[in-house]
Regions:
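HotDog/MaoC-like acyl-thioester-processing domains
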Residues: 2-12, 45, 70, 74-76, ...
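Small beta-barrel nucleic-acid-binding modules, principally OB-folds
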Residues: 58-76
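Short beta-strand/loop turn elements enriched in aromatics
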Residues: 38-54
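Catalytic strand-loop segment that frames the active site of acyl-thioester-processing enzymes
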Residues: 1-43
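Residue-level recognition of specific faces of alpha-helices
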Residues: 32-35, 62, 97
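Short glycine- and Lys/Arg-enriched binding-loop motifs that mark or flank ligand-binding interfaces
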Residues: 21, 35, 54, 73, ...
Length: 141
């Protein structure tokens, strides 16, 4: 991941919930995928869109690839801070990148990305909707 200092990075923060932890008392690795989705949804809202808007237009944005790199962990009751940005935007594909930050120390605990492809409601690959492209064009590069 190569975050550019001039691009929009959306930060989302919330507490770790008990159900997200495992028998060792730390956040289960699968929970980070949910955290990535929380960050992605907040990013969309912050730029003026969301999944409901995308789906109302007859489009879908399924995940086609993902990566999660864990170098630290969080426990129940600690706060999660997620940084989300668009890593790559192509006519038919979109990549979001993420960092899960320890809110007290600033340490990057988890990093990763999700790649998505634009489809119609039948699963056929399509170009990104024009409104989406125009929203991203307004963002800092």
């Amino acid at each position: 991941m190569s975050k550019d200092n001039n691009q929009l990075v959306v930060e989302t923060e919330f507490p770790v919930r008990y159900a997200e932890t495992d028998a060792m008392g730390i956040v289960h690795h699968a929970s980070y995928l949910v955290y990535f989705e929380v960050g992605r949804c907040q990013f969309m809202r912050d730029i003026g869109s969301d999944y409901a808007h995308i789906e109302a237009d007859g489009c879908r944005l399924p995940v086609t690839e993902l990566k999660v790199r864990l170098v630290g962990s969080l426990s129940f009751g600690e706060r999660v801070k997620i940084r989300t940005w668009v890593e790559d935007n192509r006519s038919r594909q979109l990549t979001f990148a993420y960092e899960v930050i320890h809110p007290d120390t600033g340490a990057i605990l988890v990093s990763g990305f999700t790649k998505h492809v634009w489809t119609d409601k039948h699963g056929n690959v399509i170009r990104a909707p024009k409104y989406w492209s125009s929203l991203l064009e307004k963002l800092p590069n």
